[in-house]
Amino acid sequence: MASEELVTEQFQFFGIDVPNEVINKCVSLCDEYNIDAESFIEQWMAFSLNHLNGSSPNLDNLDTFVRKEFSKRAANRSNATSKENGQVGTGSSLTVYGAPASVQSDNEVLSDYMATTPKRVKVEIESVSNQTNDLCPASYSPSVGSNKYATRTNVGAVVHSYGDEKLLQNISEPCGHDVLNLKITQVPNDDGDIYNKAMFGFELLHEKASMFDGNIRYVSQCIMKKSGIKELTSVRCKTQAEVAVAGRIECDADARLNPKSVVLQGTWEQSLSQTVPVDLDNVKQYSLFPGQTVVMKGVNTRGEKFVAHEVFCDASPAVTDHKADLTNTLQGKMSMVVASGPYTTSDNMTYEPLKDLVTYISTHQPHVVIMTGPFLDSDHTKVKDNTMAETFKSFFDKLIDSLGELSNTSPYTKIYIVSSNKDAFHVNIYPTPAYCSRRKHTNIHFMPDPCTLNISGIIVGVTSTDILMHISQEEISVGMGGDKLSRLAGHILMQQTYYPLWPPAQSLSVDAALWAAHAQLSCIPHVLVLPSNFRYFVKEVNGCVVVNPEHLTKGTGGGTFARLLIQNLKDDKKIAAQIVRI
């Protein structure tokens, strides 16, 4: 039966605060019409959205709700017994508003918008089944699974392998019997955690300029140290002798960068933040993009254009020593699974790929699972058309509760969920604060985007933002050769930041202060996770294993995820990785 606590909890689930007198009224109505609190609140939400523009309940509109809806059901009860022969309830926990008449009990249809319990009609000619799906959101229309995803034939296929052959032979084995005492922490930032209640975008121009200037100075000093350059001059200094200048790459127009539009902005200390056009005709090889900090050698005979001879951009530090902390060192082999959203196909909200991933985790029991958003993509058609009958946040909480149940089937698996600015229920800012949920699960930990994890001495960098694609759309490259994807990933390591592009892509809202405090990469990680729309890959770049698992779904079909096996040896570490189709 309904109680004040249950009714209050159900309203809070939808983010609604209700006065005590309304709570008492709801409890009495539940008792009068013999309905539980959850069903009552769901029916109220449907009625409110369709007739009251989503208004919160009060005594007056509750009376209207009862008069219009429950009186209909009371009038139909006299015919219920004769019409229910041969019908059995499905017991589905999924609420579907406006379900087809063929799967509804004739005597219980309140209206197309009312919450009803679908029935399975037993007839000889036609049999309609209604499968339950605890990962599907409440909706005003039934959600049908993707035919393309359901009929795929390459489930579990390994499409790419990398690393030590001996480890690859064991990478697919379950790890439930191999219990590791892992110590996992987030590598801290100087400014602490990102707060959800921060004033995002509140930027003073002089503070923003000072922050960028400080970043240019620091990165350019690292480049000088690595390249053996001793002294810098102003970007506007007139000289016929070869000099070195430092600054940030910019474009002279609001357009894509090209070799004739490159501008170099110097530091305040050396150049009073002045800019100078750059002539790259004499440079044999370079790879540049807006926001990149570089050091150039060349001449500037008139002070109006810097004729570059050589470009230096590598500020990457040394790879982190995996045994730097002897009290926190990996013992044995660690299994890791990495997956990136979206977690449902673009034509439905059934989250079948996520359920298959959960099944894989339950079977193989990896030590660590890293999942990057989005979980509820703001670009999904079902999100845009407003057919969900529950809040985005409440549905996300339901997804997390389902993941929390993995503690029963895979008790030693630790799940780290990295936020995404593309989630409909979260803040649209980068760097992105960590998620939060209504319930605490001991096996689930929320991380911001980006973040750096220390897993028993193994450093893992993670971001959910497609920085590889963003840089690719703005980069100009001459004479570099080699692999483009490795070069793009190398920019992140060499610039010591998860997002070196500035101005950012139009689809991304970047807070400059948060970027300076929380998007820096102070060390070269052993593993760097960079989900991207580019084809999946695993490559070693500057001593770091870069993993692009791609996405768990691709349109209406299935995608891929990555699995890794890391072993710590006396003198070195070994990493093996595979890309697997879901």
Features from the language model and the residues they span:
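Extended recognition/assembly regions associated with phosphoester-bond processing machinery
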Residues: 1-582
